Amino acid sequence: MSIRPDRHETTKNPADEAAVRDLYRQLMDGWNRGSGEAFAAVFTEDGDLVAFDGTRFKGRKEIAPFHQQLFDKWLKGSRLVGQVEDVRFLSPDVAVMHAVGGTVMPGKTEPSPERESIQTLVATRQGGEWRFAAFQNTRVRLMGNAAAFLAWTLTDSLWKAFRLNKKTTYE
């Protein structure tokens, strides 16, 4: 899946770029294992995650239990698929990455259009280790497709009606 056909490499440091790209693979692996802890482990201790609906999670201590609840209930058995579009280094220890991806629900082979997203991630290297300091997930809404827009509108309305409150206990 690719939103843009003009994918390109944007760094001259192949080892660092490979490490940042691998971090994204680890993020997907944590999701696909259904492990909130593994999913959150790729973030810095105080990393930010902004979900597709605008909900913000601060730090692994919020990211892990929320995602575990998703993996145990609403997204049980789902898979996260994605592809890195580009990596750009702002400094030797900070990189911005864009990726496209989506959630594949059980019994499906690819994400439905309303589950496709573009993601912006900021990776930082601290003590020789790369981690994500920020993750912004935005659903792709190609306005030229009326059916996809209608599906998104309905899905968004249902999500808002039944969305998890961030203050929910994670029991």
Describe the residue ranges of each PLM region.
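A solvent-exposed, acidic/Ser-Thr-rich amphipathic alpha-helical stretch
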Residues: E17-A18, G36-D93, V100, E114
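Short proline/glycine-enriched turn/loop segments at secondary-structure junctions
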Residues: K108-S112
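Short beta-strand edge/turn micro-motifs at domain boundaries
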Residues: M1-S2, E116-A148
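Glycine-rich beta-strand-turn "strand-cap" elements at beta-sheet edges
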Residues: S2, Q83-L90, T138, L164-K167
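Outer-membrane beta-barrel domain signature
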Residues: F43, L49, P106, M143-G144, ...
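Short, low-complexity N-terminal intrinsically disordered segments enriched in polar/charged residues
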Residues: M1-E45, T153-E171
